[in-house]
From Swiss-Prot:
Residues 879-901 have a biased composition (Basic residues). A lipid is attached at D904 (GPI-anchor amidated aspartate). Disulfide bonds: none annotated. Residues 490-907 are annotated as: Disordered. It is a lipid-anchor; GPI-anchor. PANTHER family: PAXILLIN-LIKE PROTEIN 1 (PTHR24216:SF65), PAXILLIN-RELATED (PTHR24216). This is 104 kDa microneme/rhoptry antigen. Residues 905-924 form a propeptide. Residues 1-19 form the signal peptide. GO terms for cellular component: plasma membrane; side of membrane. Keywords: Cell membrane, Glycoprotein, GPI-anchor, Lipoprotein, Membrane, Repeat, Signal, Sporozoite.
Length: 924
């Protein structure tokens, strides 16, 4: 009975039920008296009202029979609408605060609607624009909890829509109705879109006819701002849903009983699956099962498990299996068979026991599903992230550090929280969490970006901001503003990076007092473990130090990463006036100190005796320190202050591209069906593959050897670590320091796990934009363009110098723009500048050019589109000024001989003729 009432209410929403093409209408009916309908009366006779709530607005739909002519619509004694000649075709009353507020009427034969609004005790006419504005005010006052897409394959009860299922004509009729506060804008089945509402239209209900899991007929009801209902019909044809007419829809319902789908019967052995006829589907939290689905054109008529027959169709021409779901193949397996017959269940259940497979019931399957869901479920705390069930990756974009979290295989995040406060939870509908980006400010999570995904390829992004007390959801625009604020805040905290402290890599602070340890005595030996200073034997210039001068904090290069040998050491020179000592550093007490008369070789490095000793005499301690005797005067490098290294700008699409690459790699690993045992977390994998960034949470900075150009007199210096396995000079060679900042390169001998080898392939950056121009914005790995030619030092490949006019590029020829060359035919051509590897991965340390004002010509003409919006490559390389376009110079033309000027008397005959004609015309 409930279903009949529901179906009747839906069908009553059609205005086509009031009058059709059967020749029965108010004008065609003879002897029918006009009636007056009162909206306050509770009539149930020939005319009545039906209450409908759609998109947050409540309507009273006027319904009447085909033999009823309504010529007047009233509210008590107040007339709303009246027409003596043409009867009412359809109409509705819009209610607000449990009372009539507005109304619209459509007369027979006139498609234009008439709108009315209640003003006091009277009803006045209203324009369509004003009616829509009033209707929008009512909708805005209604609290909308969600706007969702309806997946007709999900037929379980949930908080967004109601589901009614009944058998009709041998098929399953399912009705979907959105609940109050939830708006449906799109309808689809699995991954195939059926209908998408445009503009302000919303879907009010959907009726679908199923045979097994196959959706055959669909009827979609929608409503617009005018309150007018419309319906659209679709039919399943060749794996698509095509629109059909109402007549074909009604005829298809009658033919459902005799419906037959042509297919090829096949047999399935769950221990030996033929992937040419079947494909596999992933398990989800809602359905934690291993799915076997026949390809299009096939249907399972016989099911085996080795030698045991599990199912055999008694009528292979009609009855078969559409899908096979296997739950927990290792412990107490249960199989669910989705059949295409036997309404309304369409399912059969089998359980594996000691004696073999036996039939079972649905309650046992529900217990198994709950058990598997408990195994898959995990939670995410934004301030306490565990890598047991989650992949954790620390990333950096410009100066902003954040963390990307994704669930591991066979794990589903059902709740995201901050302690006891819940930020998001799983609501069903297969809308699961696929990725989360957590932004930390002042040591705690302050901004969270959650990506929720359903079965159809669509994403629902949720942004949550930490307030003073609670977390609140924000829009995408507010999220972008918060990101800009965090980037600006992070830039203020970072000190400018100079050449001296470019090798620190987030090491402990300098100075003897910064580490909390007492200063070392002059005769103390320095160890090789931890971040120690250089050994005494490595710097001969200390002997020429002025006696009595206190030991000053050494440069940043004295703090080397642990277990990294260093070959060349720059002697500490005089105090640089451009780099004054930090006033916060503690002053070390001055003690008289004399130079050592003889220098002992370092006990750690006996190989020093093999190196040639310098024969230059030692200079007495002068007031000013001379240059090092180990380096000629001509090779002395004078330090100059350099501007801070510019940081690359914040790229909002960086995490999107990184997430897309990870999603594609994960999908490929699932398709190959290879089981990869991951003993290490995703964090340890990224340490070996991604470039490290100082200060990034969840990571430890990798030590990088200092870089210093080689000199002819001192090409090598012994390493500091005596435990180093090899002391060959080739293993400690450091390539010359480049004038550009480069990304850290992954060592060639570092083995990568299979999962990261697939993850860090060449990414498809055009996955979302589908623009080929975006492909060059993200370069490949820097190690791909590394010079791997054999040299004198096999342990560390030699790299060629990058000078200002010799750059490592992706092409064999890098030229300045405008250079002329000849092509294969000998014709001179003008070469264009190609995008080099340095342009993609490095940043120039040159000062930024000053932008000048825009120059226009005298007529006020602005630049063209290319000048106004130059391409990105030109923005990075140069700053162009707008200049008025130069007018093309006109070539001199040969002057023509001037014609002789006619005398004035030559025009007298013409003037007289004109006067005569004018006189004649005037007389006539």
């Amino acid at each position: 009975m409930k279903f009949l009432i529901l179906l009747f209410n839906i069908l009553c929403l059609f205005p086509v039920l009031a009058a059709d093409n059967h020749g029965v209408g108010p004008q065609g009916a003879s002897g029918v008296d006009p009636i007056t309908f009162d909206i306050n009366s509770n009539q149930t006779g020939p005319a009545f009202l039906t209450a409908v709530e759609m998109a947050g607005v409540k309507y009273l739909q006027v319904q009447h029979g085909s033999n009823v002519n309504i010529h007047r619509l009233v509210e008590g004694n107040v007339v709303i609408w009246e027409n003596a000649s043409t009867p009412l075709y359809t109409g509705a009353i819009v209610t607000n605060n449990d009372g009539p507020y507005m109304a619209y009427v459509e007369v027979l034969g006139d498609p234009n609607l008439q709108f009315f609004i209640k003003s006091g005790d009277a009803w006045v006419t209203l324009s369509e624009h004003e009616y829509l504005a009033k209707l929008q005010e009512i909708r805005q006052a209604v609290h909308i909890e969600s706007v969702f897409s309806l997946n007709m394959a999900f037929q379980l009860e949930n908080n967004k829509y109601e589901v009614e299922t009944h058998a009709k004509n041998g098929a399953n009729m399912v009705t979907f109705i959105p609940r109050n506060g939830h708006i449906c804008k799109m309808v689809y089945h699995k991954n195939v879109r059926i209908y998408k509402a445009t503009g302000n239209d919303t879907v009010t209900s959907v009726v679908g006819f199923f045979r097994g899991l196959r959706l055959l007929l669909i009827n979609v009801f929608s409503i617009d701002d005018n309150g007018m209902m419309s319906n659209r019909y679709f039919q399943h044809v060749d794996d698509k849903y095509v629109p059909i007419s109402q007549k074909n829809y009604e005829t298809g319902i009658v033919k459902l009983k005799d419906y037959k789908h042509a297919y090829h019967p096949v047999d399935l052995d769950i221990k030996d699956i033929d992937y040419t006829m079947f494909h596999l589907a992933d398990a989800t939290y809602h359905e934690p099962c291993f799915k076997i689905i026949p390809n299009t054109g096939f249907c399972i008529t016989k099911l085996f498990d080795g030698d045991q027959v599990l199912y055999e169709s008694f009528n292979p021409l009609i009855h078969c299996i559409n899908e096979v779901h296997i739950y927990d193949r290792n412990n107490g397996s249960i199989i669910c068979l989705h059949l295409n017959y036997s309404p309304p269940s369409y399912k059969a259940y089998l359980v594996l026991k000691d004696t073999g497979w036996e039939a079972t019931t649905h309650p046992l399957l529900e217990e198994k599903i709950e058990e598997l869901q408990d195994q898959r479920a995990c939670e995410l705390d934004v301030n306490f992230i565990s890598d047991k069930d989650l992949y954790v990756a620390a990333l950096t974009n410009a100066d902003l550090n954040y963390t990307m979290v994704t669930p591991r295989p066979h794990r589903d995040v059902i709740r995201v929280s901050d302690g006891s406060e819940v930020l998001w939870y799983y609501e069903g509908l297969d809308n699961f969490l696929v990725c989360a980006w957590i932004y930390v400010s002042d040591g705690v999570a302050s901004l969270v970006h959650l990506r929720i995904k359903d079965r159809i390829p669509a994403n629902n992004d949720i942004y949550v901001l930490k307030g003073d007390l609670y977390w609140t959801r924000i829009t995408k625009i507010q999220f972008t503003q918060e990101i800009k604020r965090l980037v600006k805040k992070s830039k203020k905290k970072l000190a400018p990076i100079t050449e001296e402290d470019s090798d620190k890599h987030d090491e402990p602070p300098e100075g003897p007092g910064a580490s909390g340890l007492p200063p070392k005595a002059p005769g103390d030996k320095e160890g090789s473990e931890g971040h120690k200073g250089p050994s005494k034997g490595s710097d001969s210039s200390k002997e020429g130090k002025k006696p009595g001068s206190g030991k000053k904090p050494g440069p940043a290069r004295e703090h080397k990463p642990s277990k990294i040998p260093t070959l060349s050491k720059k002697p500490s020179g005089p105090k640089d006036p451009k780099h004054p000592r930090d006033p916060k550093e503690p002053r070390k007490s001055k003690s008289p100190r004399t130079a050592s008369p003889t220098r002992r070789p370092s006990p750690k490095l006996p190989q020093l005796s093999k190196l040639p000793k310098s024969t230059s005499p030692r200079s007495p301690p002068p007031p000013t320190r001379p240059s090092s005797p180990e380096r000629p005067e001509g090779t002395k490098i004078i330090k100059t202050s350099k501007p801070p290294s510019p940081k690359p700008p914040f790229d909002p699409s960086f995490k999107e591209k990184f997430y897309d690459d990870y999603s594609k790699a994960a999908s490929r690993s699932k398709e190959t069906k290879t089981t990869v045992v991951l003993d290490e977390s995703f964090e340890s994998i990224l340490k070996e593959t991604l470039p490290e960034t100082p200060g990034t949470p969840f990571t430890t900075p990798r030590p990088v050897p200092p870089k210093r150009p080689r000199t002819p007199e001192s090409p090598f210096e012994p390493p500091k670590d005596p435990d180093s396995p090899s002391t060959s000079p080739s293993e400690f060679f450091t390539p010359p320091e480049s004038k550009r900042t480069r990304f850290h390169e992954t060592p060639a001998d570092t083995p990568l796990p299979d999962v990261t080898a697939e993850l860090f392939k060449e990414p498809d950056v055009t996955a979302e934009t589908k623009s080929p121009d975006e492909a060059m914005k993200r370069p490949r790995s820097p190690s791909e363009y590394e010079d791997t030619s054999p040299g004198d030092y096999p342990s560390l490949p030699m790299k060629r110098h990058r000078l200002e006019r010799l750059r490592l590029t992706t092409t064999e020829m890098e030229t300045d723009p405008g250079r002329m060359a000849k092509d294969a035919s000998g014709k001179p051509v003008k070469l264009k500048r190609s995008k080099s590897f340095d342009d993609l991965t490095t940043v120039e340390l040159a000062p930024e050019p000053k932008a000048s004002r825009i120059v226009v010509d005298d007529e006020g003409t602005e630049a063209d589109d290319e000048e106004t919006h130059p391409p990105e490559e030109r923005q990075k390389t140069e700053v162009r000024r707008r200049r008025p376009p130069k007018k093309p110079s006109k070539s001199p033309r040969p002057s023509k001989p001037k014609k002789p000027k006619k005398p004035d008397s030559a025009y007298i005959p013409s003037i007289l003729a004109i006067l005569v004609v004018s006189l004649i015309v005037g007389i006539l």
